[in-house]
């Protein structure tokens, strides 16, 4: 069975005063999107896990433990972890934790929680974009 991990920031830890976030965004809207993501992954027949983390070292530890527990085919990183400019360093920690903990998994990015399954589908099965390595060029 296809295994997908959706990693994002815990909705209750988001700084909604950050002007780089969409206006009107709140924890309830994010959670509703996460719930849709979980349902959509299940509807596609995937075994989808959700890992919402705090933007600190404890979050990285939780992510590392999750990655160590299962072999994932794809890990989708949510926009809340990568879009706010002030979160760049933490986003780099997330990417490196995924690279170390799931080196064979594809990494995908959603634009909002609701399109998490679409992001993963770009890299799973027949929907996978081909990647040319330098040895194939």
Where are the language model's segments positioned?
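Structural motif
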Residues: 57-64, 117-118
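Active-site rim loops that border cofactor/substrate pockets in soluble metabolic enzymes
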Residues: 37-57
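N-terminal, charge-rich interaction modules
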Residues: 1-21
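Mid-chain, well-packed structural core segment of small domains
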Residues: 61-99
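Short catalytic helix/loop segments, enriched in acidic residues and glycine
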Residues: 21-39
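Ser/Thr/Gly-rich flexible loops in soluble cytosolic domains mediating phosphotransfer, phosphorylation
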Residues: 33, 90-127
């Amino acid at each position: 069975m296809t295994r997908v991990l959706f990693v994002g920031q815990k909705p209750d830890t988001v700084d909604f005063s950050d002007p780089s976030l969409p206006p009107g965004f709140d924890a309830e809207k994010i959670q509703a999107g996460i719930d849709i993501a979980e349902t959509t992954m299940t509807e596609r027949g995937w075994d989808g896990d959700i890992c919402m983390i705090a933007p600190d070292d404890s979050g990285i530890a939780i992510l590392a433990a999750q990655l160590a527990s299962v072999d994932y085919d794809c890990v989708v990183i949510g926009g809340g972890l990568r879009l706010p400019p002030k979160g760049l360093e933490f986003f780099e920690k997330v990417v490196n934790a995924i690279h170390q903990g799931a080196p064979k998994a594809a990494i995908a990015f959603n634009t909002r929680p609701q399109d998490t399954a679409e992001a993963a589908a770009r890299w799973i099965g027949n929907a996978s974009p081909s990647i040319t390595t330098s040895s194939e060029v």
